[in-house]
Amino acid sequence: GAKITIDSASMMNKGFEVIEAKWLFGVRPDQIEVVVHPQSIIHSMVQFEDSSIKAQLGLPDMRLPIQYAFSYPDRLHASFPRLDFKTCTQLTFEQPDTKRFRNLALAYEALHQGGNMPCIINAANEVVVSAFLNDRISFLGMSDVIEKCMQQVSFIEKPTYEDYVATDKLTRIMANEL
């Protein structure tokens, strides 16, 4: 939908994936690296201690990665087109431009700080994306509001469930006012 389109364009979606990877796989933030892959053929890669790499490849379509995630460890028959390596002549990778796409850098900052900071960035992002879709904020202005919320909402190192609920509410109020 519209929100995921904006999150992808601003690279906040990648930022959320970095935060998710830390929790899903129990890795340190410095073990998670984002690379831009313009062909969108490689959906994920893991490099192991011995330097070998396992990658999940497919057409630029999220049906296969989602099917794989839901059916693992089983493999289901795919009813959609398959990747043909004969037509896949080039795979390129680039470093993300975190100066231009500040949301990815903000997500890494939230991950490094921990505590309730990922909650703050999530709540602020939901508000600014809605504001952008309703023509109340510019595309680049979204990052400014998220960053201000990260600076102004009280940081809690070891939040309780109640702290998360309060943080979410306060951040949404603040983001709407900025």
Residue ranges: model-predicted function:
Residues 1-178:
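Catalytic, metal-anchored helix/loop core of enzyme active sites in primary metabolism
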